């Protein structure tokens, strides 16, 4: 580019074939570049109250934290757990859910392994919460997979929301089940319960190998971008001068580069798409 406005703008490739609407993604990225992010986003970490597992989860703002959030539920909604027949279920399922791109092995010998990613998104709701907005991004590879599993679990408990994971990397799902949180793991949304395999009934989750799932995952992101990202100049979904609300630049840039035939390195796209599904 001859006159780039920002560093990310300088290396932008707008000619390349992208699956998603690049115009909207870049409108949103450029708009976000003008914001003071500290006013919209908090960095921090989750921990169990007094270090005792399976009690309450506490959120602590922390510049070294791996979580970025743009919305926190009010106190009454935090740690909202429902006990049914002695099993734990998320109490804020009507407000939103998580999507997760997990990994199973701790170290990677050659090169850099892909990160684990967690995305949280609200749905349309009448509670004191934003609607159809991403509110949490976590893209990290802590030293061990166990730390990652525990951090994901704490986020789910704190927000009281269920999570959709890929079940071809089942360790995270076993972590949930063994700790009594099977009720937090969403069953694959594209099949009825009696059509699920034995493992899917046991753990929840969705396979990422089938073409159908890849397609519906990509079209979930595509339609989210059309409705909620950048400017809607035609005014199909909102006023034409209303900028979308999507503060997570990492996820936006991941969407811009996303390649459906080589999904492995796009952690944020995988997790955000699962959250939308």
Located regions from the model:
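Short alpha-helix plus adjacent loop in nuclease-associated cores
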Residues: 185-234
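RNase H-like, metal-dependent nuclease domains and their acidic two-metal-ion catalytic environment used
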Residues: 1-188, 227-277
